[in-house]
Structure formats: structure tokens, C-alpha cells
Amino acid sequence: MMQPTILLLKDGTDTSQGKAQIISNINAVQSIVEIVKTTLGPRGMDKLIEGNRGATISNDGATILNLLDIVHPAAKTLVDIAKAQDDEVGDGTTSVCLLAGELLKESKNFIEEGMHPQIVTKGYKEALKLALTFLQENSYSVADKSDGEKREMLLKCAQTSLNSKLLAHYKEFFSEMVVQAVETLDTNLLDKDLIGIKMVTGGSVTDSVLVKGVAFKKTFSYAGFEQQPKKFANPKICLLNIELELKAEKENAEIRIDNPDDYKSIVDAEWELIYEKLRKIVESGAQIVLSKLPIGDLATQYFADRNIFCAGRVDAEDIKRVQKATGSIVQTTVNGLSQDVLGTCGMFEEQQIGAERYNLFQDCPHSKSATIILRGGAEQFIAEAERSLNDAIMIVRRCMKANKIVPGGGAIELEISRLLRLHSRKTEGKVQLVINAFAKALEVIPKTIADNAGHDSIQVLNKLRQKHALESDQSKNFGVDINAVDGIGNNFENFVWEPIIVRKNAFSAATEAACTILSIDETVRNPKSEQPKAPPGGLRRGGPQGMAGLAKNARLGK
């Protein structure tokens, strides 16, 4: 007797499973890796991506992957690990994608030959544990160095980060600016939110300035603003989250009165309410008033007559930074406004920078902060420069916290690769092959840097393997030197340094991503569920909502 067909999934559902599915996922990841591969290293190329948000020029792995509309579910894993690397460390986003792709490429041969994915996963996790141990053993501590040596180390780490960016030609100028900005912060917290980057179109890149305090662009102002003072020493600062303007009547508003004098009393009461608010602010002793909400022309003129500076519609992020830097507390009412909630700074002034005017709060006593005002020509250039500086700031912060560095340019990857190969000889079974594959995958970093710089990567890798095989304290620091004729150099002596946390995070994230993709053996997709849904509350034929909509349209005369 024939067994009836049992349908478990909706009609049209696509299911893929088994070895073919794993291979398909690996191929999808490989195609994404090929896109970002050419952006790695000091000679990496940029990508021009045009989408709904306009044209974007970038060579930052996380930015590129975020702008690409990737639909393959397995390939989206790369976007996640690049974003995690960017959020956690700030740099190494392309490296982590390349490493994950290479680990999957190496595992593809094992899967095709019949090795179980869990054996590959186990081998990769064991290799990762060894790699992190070797990473610690081959790092250099700077905790016992002098302040001058530490600062030099921070400058070199910032320059290494900027080497592969659009600002590579100005790395000395911007690395000094970045280190100064991070040094301004409280050394115990190193809160990145207290460093702001403001972009001003026009002028040269070298016209960029560092403000040791908070700076933001002058907001929209009403008549009377010109009469307000633009410079204060040790001012009292009041932060508000209330409107200080007369509200217009709402459309179709209705007031029922028996006597025309009643209307005058209503208007007078409204004026009295706003004047009462303004009086309380003045009585508190505030000399600078900032609000997230509008400050109207009446309030602007009132403050100008009393030598008080005011600015409304200030961005929430800028208010937050001013609050942290000056010690002010944002108020949602002016009732009970006292000296306790007012902040202060050493100097406040409004300055012209390029075509814009900026409000500068300097010498802030409570929480030290800094603002980089970035200049440049094209908007796309400034936007990419801002992303580059963000990466460098994150790197310097991490360096100050970790106090350990490793040589860059693929040097540490080659040394760990050599040590893993030696260790694999002592390992039994199939795991030995997987550890060897992990060691080979690490070589993708120096290989790609050499390729992107125009060197013969095969020759460069052979020379580097020979150097690292000498097992000396100097030879282990050899990596790709794009300026050398033979393509190799001692990257520790060449000051190509990276914080250990960048490599540690990259190895861990790439391995986790590879293991996650290898553990997926089935994908279930329902094309119908991916179709755009009708907006909620739409017209439904014969339904109550549909009738209500028709009735409303009839009232409006549609």
C-alpha cells in the first residue's frame, strides 16, 4: 500500500540541505570576501558605492559591507562580524572578513572529501586557543615604558591604522591630533563619546583643528541674537529640554468667550507664563542657555537685553557632551532652578571656522573632552576621513587600555602560523590537518597586503617563511614592507605596530563566524514570506476598517 505524501511546509518553500548546502554557503561568503579583499593594507583600493544615501567612497570593510544590500543569509554573517569588530576595536574589519573567508575556503576541501563539519569546527576551535596563546607570548608590553615612549607607541599605532586609509598622506598630522584628543580624556574612563568629530566643507585637510573641549555648529537663531555676547570666561551654563517661545494656535482651534476682554486675559496669561520662565532662568545666574527645543525670538531678545547667550534646537548628542564636560544637568522645567544644576567651563566663545560659526566650550573641569573639526573639499572625502579618524581613535584608546602591541603587516600572523604547524606535528588524527589548515589560512593577511601593493605575493611569502624559520627574536618580527624592494622588512623596527586586542578580536570573530557557517546544514526559505506585506490598517473590502475609511473620506469630501 502506498504511503500518503505528508506536507510539513507551505507550498513554494525551498529547502536545501546536506553537504551541498554547506558548500553553497562557503561559496556565498567567498564572493563577498572577494569584494573587500582589495581594500586591505596601505596600498588597498577604495570602493565607490552608490545607493539611496548617495555615493560613498570607502575602504573600510565594515562600511562597505553595511552599504551592500546582501540577501544571502549565510553571507550576512560577515556583515555581523565586521560590525562587531568595528564596534569593539575600530580597526581590522577587512582582516576579520578575509580570515573568515580563508578558513571556510580551507574547510571546503575537507567537507568535499567527506570529513564531518564538527571535526573541522573542533580543530578550528583548538587552533584558535593555541593562536591566542602564541599571540600573548609574542606581544610586547609597554606598561613599564616611560611616558614619552608610551606616547611614541600611541602615535605609531595611530599611523598604522591611518596607513590604509584615505588620510595616509597626512598620517603624521592626524595621528598627533588623535593622540592629543585621547590624552585629553579622563584616563580611567577613556569615553569615546566625549570626542566629537565635526565636518566642515572647504579648505585643506591640514586646516583641520583640535578643540580641547566641546564644539558644535551654531544653531538657527532669531532676531536679537547679534546683540548677545559671544565670549565668556567661567560662565554658568544652563541646559534645558523645554520650549521658550510663544506657541501658535492649533489649526481650527476654538475659544468660547462671553466678553472680548476675556480673550485679552487669555493672551496676557500666555505672555505672563513665558516671561515667568525667562525671569527664573535669569534669576538662576545662568549666562549661557542651551536647549534641545526651540528658543523663540521673544526669548532671544529678552536674553540679549540681559547679556545672556542662548541657542535652541541643539543636537541631543552635543547637549550630552556639554552636560558631561561642564557638569550641567538637563532640566525639563525652570521651577526650582538653582546653582546646583548649572555647569561651567573655563572659556566659551563663538568662532568662525570656514563658512560656518561654531560654539566652543574649552577648559571643561568636570569631564575632559575634545572635538576634531575636520576640513576638506568633497563631502565624500570628508565623510571617509571621519570614518578613518574614528578607527584611529578607537585604536589609540584600546592601546592605552591593553598596554600590549604586536608587529603588523602580517608579521604576527606568519609567526603564529609557523608555531601552529610545529604544534600540529604533535597532534593525532584528523584534527592535525585542520590545525594545519588554520595555520595556512593566517597567511592570507600578508599575502593579500603584498598583492594589493603590487608585489609578487608568492616570492614575498617564501622569503618571510625563511625569515621566521630562523626562530630568532628579530626574525619573528618580519612582515610585508610595501616600500622595500624585496617586499619584506622588520615591522617592529619600522614602527608598524598594532594593539594586541585588534588581532585577538579578529582571530576570535573570524573563527566563530567560520564555525557558525560550517554548522549550518539546512536552509529553509519561503519566497512568499519574503514578499512585501500590505501596510497595517489598510482598506479591506467589506471590513469594518474599510467602511470607516470610506466614511472618513465622505466627510472630507473626497
From Swiss-Prot:
Record InterPro entries: Chap_CCT_eta, Chaperone_TCP-1, Chaperonin_TCP-1_CS, Cpn60/GroEL/TCP-1, GroEL-like_apical_dom_sf, GROEL-like_equatorial_sf, TCP-1-like_intermed_sf, TCP-1_chaperonin
This protein's GO CC annotations: chaperonin-containing T-complex
One GO molecular-function entry: ATP binding
Alphabetical UniProt keywords: ATP-binding, Chaperone, Cytoplasm, Nucleotide-binding
Subcellular locations according to the entry: Cytoplasm
Region called Disordered, residue ranges: 524-558
Pfam families according to UniProt: Cpn60_TCP1
Disulphide-bridged cysteine pairs: none
UniProt record similarity statement: Belongs to the TCP-1 chaperonin family.
Subunit structure of this chain's protein: Heterooligomeric complex of about 850 to 900 kDa that forms two stacked rings, 12 to 16 nm in diameter.
Function: Molecular chaperone; assists the folding of proteins upon ATP hydrolysis. Known to play a role, in vitro, in the folding of actin and tubulin.
UniProt protein name: T-complex protein 1 subunit eta
Species of the source: Tetrahymena pyriformis
